[in-house]
Amino acid sequence: MSEEQPIKWTTYLAGGMENVSKKEMIDFRETFMKKLQHEDLLIYSPVAQEASKVGANPGDHIKHIQGLKRGGHWDIFFERMWKIWFGNINQNTDLIQLGINLRMRKHIDGNRRSEIVSWGDFEAVIRSDFIIVYHPTSIKTVGTHFEVVFAFLFRIPIYLVVPDAPPTESNSSLIFGTQISNNKAIRVFRTINECVTQVKADCKLK
């Protein structure tokens, strides 16, 4: 049996989770995964990966987390959230050094499809070549903003899709974060198709 080879490109699909409907959470990610499916591209969808870490169906894992919070089960809540964000990494780990180490591991060893089941969302972003952020202005989200910060700290390119507003009407800090990652360029799209076209061109996916 041949050894599994690293995948050329890796991306992370960021967007609303907790304050959107299950359909809204899943649909845009499935669309991206279908349109960008390619042997040279590894796509990390946090919906499926987070759900597997808490033993729930994709999309339903949000209710599981909310139930722990509303029931006052804070210790279990923390354990589940740590699992979602950091996988099996020790909770006492220096997170700054962790990010540096994970980024170096991506550059030295590459990423393989079989590995992503053990990644938390933090590792998935840090080990990405670029991330895709779907961010309607009406959506309330915090986790997505975490992911944008992780990306721009490591200068990981960000493709931002804002379907309901032009860049001039989008959140200023969000736009600025993408500029940090994109060498000051504005890489903001109004539609998924526009974003997909640009990703395919940049990564030479045919």
Positions of PLM-derived features:
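Conserved catalytic or regulatory cores that recognize and/or transform ribose-phosphate-containing ligands
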Residues: M1-K206
